Amino acid sequence: MKLHKFYYSVSICIFTALFVCLNSFAQNTGKRVIKGSVVDANTGDPIPFATVSLKGTTVGANTDDKGRFFIETSIPADIILFSFIGYQTESRNISRGTEQIINIRLRLSIIELDEVRVKPRRVNYKNKDNPAVELIKKVIEKKDFNRQEVYNYLEFKKYEKIQFAISNITEKFKQGSQFIKFRFAFDNLDTTKRIGNTVLPVFIKESLSDYYSQKDPKAAKEIIRAEKITNLNEYFDNKGVSGYLNYLYQDINIYDNEILFITNKFLSPVAKSAPNFYRYYILDTLSVNNINCIKLFFEPRNKQDFLFHGNLYIIMDSSYAIRKIDMGINKNINLDWIQEISITQDFDQFGQQGWLLSKEEILIDFGIIKNSLGLYGQRTVSYKDYKINEPLSAVIFKGPEKIERFVPSANSAGFWESNRYVPLTKSEKGTYTTIDSLKKIPEFKKKMKLLTLITTGFYDLGNIEIGPVESFYSYNSVEGSRFRFGGRTTTGYSKKITFDAYAAYALKADLFKYNAGVTYSLTPGTIYQFPVKSIRLNYQNDTRIPGQELLFTQPDNLFLSFKRGPDDKLFLNKTIKAELLNEFESHFSYLAGYSFTRQSPLGNIHFTTNDYSSYTNDISHINISELFLNLRYAANESFYQGKIYRFPFPGKDPVIQLKTAFGSKSIYNDYDYIRLQLNLSRRYYVSVIGYTDIMVEAGKIIGEVPYPLLFIHTANQTYYYQKNSYSLMNFLEFVSDQYISLNIDHSFNGFILNKIPLVRKLKFREVVTFKVLYGSLSKNNNPDYNAELFKFPTDESGIPLTYSLDKKPYVEAGVGLSNILRIFRVDFVKRFTYTGHPNVSNHGFLIQFRFDI
């Protein structure tokens, strides 16, 4: 019995072993290899990412970038299929042989594409084993070879046209009583710009440029040869408007990782990290101007991020160059005043070289409410006459990246007709004549003067203008109600010389103040035309709050009259100043001059070397006589020239400023010293998470001076947010003779709040701020160690109100929301150090009027 069981077990083992061996042999003899290539039947070009599959099975593969495929399988099948979007599917019979080579030529399908957006299924989207992702990775891998910066030298000509039109013009709007005298303007309506929408062109700017670039050392230069613009220079800074449009419509290089567009940084769909932020879908293959391309649709993974959506048309060869782009942005992005954006770029091959940009069109629909009255903007750029790798002289690249060198005939009647690359439409031509006609109508002039008053604070009376109106009334606790009235001459009086003056009276202090100045232009242009070269002489008898330094705001301002904490310290300055301003096209400038100030204390400020709490003055005033030199460099800066201030647009380059002053008894100063200040500021864009403004400043005083001549650190006791001031520091709270400071202001552009349902509909934008100040005061300049110096201010009990920063830095930080009601920013700020000082606020809210896109 046992022997029987033994033979039975052995038989089972032998049978099993034979079965496994035979089965393995059968599998090995059935395995086969199929390989080959897939190419375009018309051009012979390889077709990457084509699908190769065995009919009736799940076995298959995709062709590589050279159109090659390889399949190894033991699954029986008789037919192999070859397919790719836009091509006719082909099939071939296959045998049971061990290796077969099949080369297939696919023919294009004839497909009529409707004007619809294809929305592919998004179920279980993943990057792994995704042909669309593999394709975009090839584009990214090759992009450094396809961008124009790859060439050692590059030269081309460029024609740019920017135009704006009032959109959604209705019959009711046209019949409005306010337009009775302007009805002729509606004869220039255009219905071709936007399908189903009537627009009224109101602005057009054209320019012709020569562009040069070199790879090593990296340099670029654009020389504007001619420019034509609708002229409203009496009311607006035409150059400033042009500069803002260039800032708004910056050149788009799709091969860059990040694209600066409408003041925000967007991640490019061909950025190195793009597959982590975008989804990609291969939609079709089609011919774009006789070039076979793969149409690749892309969209953001998160619709609230600063990303594009649209189509890339990728050339079907080993270059993986981009033939065409059409893209826009998602309506859920936190962009203000914008309803819709469309961007189109076409690339052409010039000679046997690579694919270079030939045409670009950007359309922006500005508006608050969709389908209501808005503003429609269009930028069209055409490129031609490319010269590649023809050596260029180094002289070309000297100076700023963009300069004007107008050809003599640029303003002649026939110049633009023969030189613009694309003819103007009838309505575009009419824009120039319509604006010229409107300027002759008295009613239009009145409305423009009113608009100028609202936007600039000045009202034009012809040869003079009065303002700024926001300074006509203000209040402080020392002077009480303060009334001021002033104005200046306009270019209607003289383009070379400008007079300005104001008079002010304070009720409580019973003081009369005034200012008078004259500025003379040393160039044929006015004192407002860059580059400015001018001399100025000015006399001022007025008060100043110690430590208040305002940006783009007059100190006599109704909105700055509301303050927290005591506001009882003023200097009364009687100053005569002579200065020379010299600006260069490179955006380097210097301001040199001499000033003499007789400074007196006012309110609860006293000049005493004894007990400050006695509130008496040992002397009535000090004499401050200085020679000064200020240097500034802001490479490639563009700006809007306002009536008082110059408003720069943030650029890619840092702004560097050095201020120096020399005071000496030999020039009738009461003290001997040298004062130095260095300031560096720059904006950094951080792709989808916004941008950061950083400012670093340092200062040093060499000499022995009283506290009015020390660095009185910039404080802000108002409720209006000032970026360059310390929001919770009191006036005259801190002084130093040397310091260094860091100011960081970051805007997230809604990156966080856009992820929160409902909240994102408000389109708020998060901001964070951080300000730190390190300072010190030497014993020579500290009244506690030097009895000859004025005592620091105290209250009546002798408690100090002014301090040095020797022990620790001053630190404050805040969080806030901008884009509230589209125009306001509110910050909550907390003070972290020196919180025990008298009369200080350790936290608070501040507001700012701020216009962002």
Enumerate the predicted regions with their spans.
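Hydrophobic beta-strand segments
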Residues: A50-L54, I80, V118, F156, ...
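Short, acidic Ser/Thr/Gly-rich low-complexity loop/linker segments typical of extracellular
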Residues: T58-R68
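Exposed, low-structure sequence patches enriched in small/polar residues
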Residues: N264-F266, I388, F397-I853
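Bacterial Sec-dependent N-terminal signal peptides
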Residues: M1-K35, V52, E112-P120, I527, ...
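A short, solvent-exposed loop/turn motif at the edges and junctions
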Residues: L54-G56, I79-R92
